[in-house]
Amino acid sequence: MNDLNSVLIEGTIIEAARATADNRCMFSMLSVRYESDSVNGGTKKVELPLEVEVKLWRLAKACIENLPVGRRIRVVGRLEGEALAVGGGFERYCLRVVAEHVEFKPIKA
């Protein structure tokens, strides 16, 4: 049996899509959710900034053309990890979302 590696995230673009090597693109988005605050009662706002990579060249081109800052989107994809050397013999592990499907929400006038 294979492990499930799938994510669905909705949010707002905070850094416009930019081209990278090999006809790919990267963009940053912010997903906001509200959760109950057991200490103070009520709810609190939780913001989650994410870095999203698009590896499919045709989807990457569409993202570069259609993702200005402030646009709402829905991303379906998978998590991918990478180990980064920080210095002093330490490594830092980062996760990014690799988009397989991007839905552009309508721009409100």
Please give the residue ranges for each predicted region.
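Single-stranded nucleic acid-binding surfaces, predominantly the OB-fold ssDNA-binding core
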Residues: M1-A109
